[in-house]
């Protein structure tokens, strides 16, 4: 965690902790009360719009999961979606927006590579290939 603390701004670290706590709270409440189910759905959408969480997830899970597992592919897909969503909130053409788009594109390429390799191993047809 010392390395992680050096890499992340304190505000981002606290933001992640708060997001986790809020997620647990809304999840337990949504089980008990239908009214909170909408709140839980909104929270899920809000979390996907945070690029820093995508990076933390990759740093945390990538060393643990097998390199060519579908979970790693889906992890990269989620990261791509989150980073693209955050880039969409910024003004078009800014340096930060362009940087986020490049990072999202890299995650998308990695996701495609991992998932298409898995499909090839199991003989699943790739519908994107031209016949």
Positions of predicted regions on the chain:
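Extended alpha-helical scaffold/coiled-coil
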Residues: 1-131
